[in-house]
Amino acid sequence: MAIETAENRTPKVIEVTEIMNMLPHRYPFLLVDRVTDYEEGKWLRAIKNVTVNEPCFTGHFPSSPVFPGVLILEAMAQATGVLAVATYGKMREDELYYFAAIDNARFKRPVVPGDQLVLEVEFLKEIRGITKFTGKAYVNGKLACEADLMCARK
């Protein structure tokens, strides 16, 4: 995996109940199940458990279900939202965190029911309220997806 941490530090975990206080998303669109570690303003690692009960599998594809790439990208974007809130604090009532742009998206392998996506996002820079991140998603230690993400908090 890309993000390396010191072996002697205790991981910072955020459970789904706290994630629901950080993000406005709800079923079926909350795509971050747990944060397994993060460092404010730098990086975050989270998981998304993919089950056969995901609503997308009724049509993508019923006889051979594959988790849609766009939902992997959305999961990475939601992970950046958790990192932003963990870094800068909870959003105001009238504020939203938007997925603004994506570049260089690459899908390396299919993600299927039973897989656990390990999402890794790293802060790159912020310019005029737009924050740029790089994101990667792994299954069993193998890269499934990578992309550059831009998000805005307004």
From Swiss-Prot:
It is an enzyme of class 4 (lyase). It is found in: Cytoplasm. GO terms for molecular function: (3R)-hydroxyacyl-[acyl-carrier-protein] dehydratase activity. GO terms for biological process: fatty acid biosynthetic process; lipid A biosynthetic process. Its EC number is 4.2.1.59. InterPro entries: FabA_FabZ, FabZ, HotDog_dom_sf. The active site is at H60. Keywords: Cytoplasm, Lipid A biosynthesis, Lipid biosynthesis, Lipid metabolism, Lyase. GO terms for cellular component: cytoplasm; membrane. The keyword Cytoplasm applies. Involved in unsaturated fatty acids biosynthesis. Catalyzes the dehydration of short chain beta-hydroxyacyl-ACPs and long chain saturated and unsaturated beta-hydroxyacyl-ACPs. PANTHER family: 3-HYDROXYACYL-[ACYL-CARRIER-PROTEIN] DEHYDRATASE. This is 3-hydroxyacyl-[acyl-carrier-protein] dehydratase FabZ. It comes from Haemophilus ducreyi (strain 35000HP / ATCC 700724). The gene is fabZ.
